[in-house]
C-alpha cells in the first residue's frame, strides 16, 4: 500500500498532504538553522563524506559505501565508517565494532560494512560521537557516513546521494504522503548523484548492482545461484523486489519470495519455518549477517557489488582523495 501511495498510483496520498507539509516545514527549518549559523555543526579534524538518500526506502546506499571504502583503501587511504545503527540497540553509545559485535547491538548494515571492508566502524545516534570514537582508537584519514544526509549536526566535506533509478522520487512529496526526506531540488547542492539501475540523467553517475556467486552461510562454499534448486527467496531490505528481480535475472527462479521489513529482527524459528523439505533458502547478504549464527546447511546468500560506470567515478574519487592530508 505504501508503495502505491508513494508512486502516485493510489489517491490516498492527498489525505496525507497536511502531514507532509508539516514534515517539509520542520525539515527545511532545521537545515536553514544550520545554514544561517543559528545552530552549529561539529566539524571533524578529518574530511567527512556523507552517503545518503533523499527518499525513504532502499536505494542501494550500503553497496555504494562499501564500494567507496574499498576504492579508497586501494589508494592507500585509511578509512573509518560511522552509522546510526538502525535495527540495533547497544548497551552504550558510541559503539566501536569488533569481530564479536552482533547485529542486535550495531544493526545489520554496520556489521556488513565491517565484515566486507575491515574498516573501523562505529555507531551512535549522534554521528559526531561515533566519529570521535573512531578517531580516538584508529589513525584514520577520512570518515564515510552511512546515511546521515539530513543529520546536519555533523559537518561534511562531500555529499553523495544515491537514487533508485526505477522509482526515483515517486510522487515527489515529503513523508508521509510521498517518499521524500527532502525535495529533489536538494540535488543541486550535492557533490554527486549515483543512480542505481534505470537510466541516469545528465550529470548523474550510473550504477548497477552486480551479483556474485551464491555463498553458503555455514560452509562458505560458492556456486552459481542458478544451480540451486527449489529456492525460497528472503529479503529484509528497503526494496525487496529488487533482490527477487536480481535472482530471476541470474536464472534462479524462486518458488516463493518472502519480503521482510528493512532491519527486521530475525528469530531462528521464523526463518527455519520459511523452508520446507528439499527447499533451499537464498537471502541477501544483509540478512546473512543476522542469520549466520543459526544457519542451516541449505541456506545461501547472494552478495552484490556496486558497479559505477563512466569517467565520473574516477573524478569523484580523485576529488575525495585530494581532501586527505
From Swiss-Prot:
Pfam assignment, any one: LpxK
GO cellular component: plasma membrane
SUPFAM superfamilies: P-loop containing nucleoside triphosphate hydrolases
Domain of life where this protein originates: Bacteria
Coiled-coil spans in chain: none
Residues given in the record as ATP binding sites: 55-62
Reactions this protein catalyses: a lipid A disaccharide + ATP = a lipid IVA + ADP + H(+)
GO terms for MF: ATP binding; tetraacyldisaccharide 4'-kinase activity
Keywords noted in UniProt: ATP-binding, Kinase, Lipid A biosynthesis, Lipid biosynthesis, Lipid metabolism, Nucleotide-binding, Transferase
UniProt GO BP: lipid A biosynthetic process; lipopolysaccharide core region biosynthetic process
InterPro entries xrefs: LpxK, P-loop_NTPase
EC number: 2.7.1.130
Pathway(s) annotated for this protein in UniProt: Glycolipid biosynthesis; lipid IV(A) biosynthesis; lipid IV(A) from (3R)-3-hydroxytetradecanoyl-[acyl-carrier-protein] and UDP-N-acetyl-alpha-D-glucosamine: step 6/6
Function: Transfers the gamma-phosphate of ATP to the 4'-position of a tetraacyldisaccharide 1-phosphate intermediate (termed DS-1-P) to form tetraacyldisaccharide 1,4'-bis-phosphate (lipid IVA).
Family matches, as HAMAP family: LpxK
Family: Belongs to the LpxK family.
Protein name: Tetraacyldisaccharide 4'-kinase
UniProt organism field: Salmonella dublin (strain CT_02021853)
Gene, per the UniProt record: lpxK
Amino acid at each position: 500500500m505504501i508503495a502505491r501511495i508513494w508512486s502516485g498510483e493510489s489517491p490516498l496520498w492527498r489525505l496525507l498532504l497536511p502531514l507532509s507539509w508539516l514534515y517539509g516545514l520542520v525539515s527545511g527549518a532545521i537545515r536553514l538553522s544550520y545554514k544561517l549559523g543559528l545552530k552549529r555543526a561539529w566539524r571533524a579534524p578529518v574530511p567527512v563524506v556523507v552517503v545518503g538518500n533523499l527518499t525513504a526506502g532502499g536505494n542501494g546506499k550500503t553497496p555504494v559505501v562499501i564500494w567507496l571504502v574499498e576504492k579508497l583503501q586501494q589508494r592507500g587511504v585509511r578509512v573509518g565508517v560511522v552509522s546510526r545503527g538502525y535495527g540495533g540497540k547497544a548497551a552504550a553509545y558510541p559503539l566501536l565494532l569488533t569481530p564479536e559485535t552482533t547485529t542486535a547491538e550495531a544493526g545489520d548494515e554496520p556489521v556488513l560494512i565491517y565484515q566486507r571492508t575491515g574498516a573501523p566502524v562505529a555507531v551512535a545516534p549522534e554521528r559526531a560521537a561515533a566519529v570521535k570514537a573512531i578517531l580516538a582508537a584508529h589513525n584514520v584519514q577520512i570518515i564515510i557516513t552511512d546515511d546521515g544526509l539530513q543529520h546536519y549536526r555533523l559537518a561534511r566535506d562531500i555529499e553523495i546521494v544515491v537514487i533508485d533509478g526505477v522509482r526515483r522520487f515517486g510522487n515527489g512529496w515529503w513523508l508521509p504522503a510521498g517518499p521524500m526526506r527532502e525535495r529533489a531540488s536538494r540535488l543541486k547542492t550535492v557533490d554527486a548523484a549515483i543512480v542505481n539501475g534505470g537510466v541516469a540523467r545528465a550529470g548523474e553517475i550510473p550504477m548497477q548492482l552486480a551479483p556474485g556467486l551464491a555463498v553458503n552461510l555455514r560452509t562458505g562454499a560458492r556456486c552459481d545461484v542458478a544451480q540451486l534448486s527449489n529456492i525460497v527467496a528472503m529479503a529484509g531490505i528497503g526494496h525487496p523486489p529488487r533482490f527477487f528481480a536480481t535472482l530471476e535475472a541470474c536464472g534462479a527462479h524462486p518458488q516463493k519470495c518472502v519480503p521482510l521489513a528493512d532491519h527486521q529482527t530475525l528469530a531462528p524459528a521464523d526463518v527455519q519455518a520459511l523452508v520446507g523439505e528439499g527447499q533451499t533458502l537464498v537471502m541477501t547478504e544483509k540478512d546473512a549477517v543476522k542469520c549466520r549464527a543459526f544457519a542451516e546447511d541449505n541456506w545461501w546468500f547472494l552478495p552484490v557489488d556496486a558497479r559505477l560506470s563512466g569517467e565520473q567515478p574516477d573524478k569523484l574519487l580523485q576529488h575525495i582523495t585530494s581532501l586527505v592530508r
